[in-house]
Amino acid sequence: MKDLRVIFFGTPRFACEILKALIEEKYHIVAVVSQPDKPVGRKRKIMPTPVHELADAHGIPVLQPAKLRLQADEVLAYQPDLIVTCAYGQMIPDVILDAPAYGCLNIHPSLLPKYRGGAPVHRAVMNGDEETGVCLMEMVHAMDAGDVFARRIVKIDEEDTTETLNLKLEKAGCDLIREALPGVVDGTLKGEPQGENYTLARNIAPEEEKVSFAAEDVNVIYNHIRGLIDWPIAYGVIEGKRIKFYAVRRKTEENDHVPGTVMGFEDGCMKIACMKGYLYVKELQPEGKSRMDAKAFANGAGRALTGKVFE
């Protein structure tokens, strides 16, 4: 079974951990397909994707097509018996999906059929869900619609962000692929149809990054902010400038303040009045500045915002 020729598709850290599990389990990874490397940081230095970096470390050939459908022949030249994908980032064309004798499998970070699509982890946190999970599923021509072979439930704590939840899901996904893949390949583990009662987890739109203090209560705002950590990061606008929110907590308490009012700084946090409570911002990034803690911000220009109102 582990002599099967496997091609792995993936890009970010989450996918990197799944690839690492396959390598540790001695599967024969003949090639890896990842998104093109991109410039990062202020110096815009080209950096390899996490999956690219891991594949290089193990001497595995890497393909990084900008448009996969135009380079399908290069992928199929590796004659895969099985394809495994996780957070790749492009639609895989039918000519590739139909090629492997053992099919194409995907590790998806939600409890399908809930949250098909590109941002299932973000949406679970933003919606205040108490649990999510990972599924090992068959890839079909419709997005995230294939039969589910196995799943694992993961609890979402109140303090979890998308960043911390991804770490939990990475571990669950690695455990799942180790336990379930042999049964899928030898035919002893059968898939279950998802049915038609599904929900979508659309990608985060730029306009969703802005927090609306006037329209949402403290619980919605808190979930919104932690759902966008560590990317793309939620922000508020005050005095015409953006402030990004990196670490927050909340306190539920009825009050008569105008939502979005900066009440001052206490316990190392910027305190903002919201409907049904207060938001405490511990780490932030003022427009044009570096990320800092709220205490440092207060000692600079921050305290002058007391009494001002976020849009």
Where are the language model's segments positioned?
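One-carbon transfer enzymes
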Residues: 1-232, 277-280, 286, 305-311
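An anion-binding loop in the catalytic cleft
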Residues: 214-311
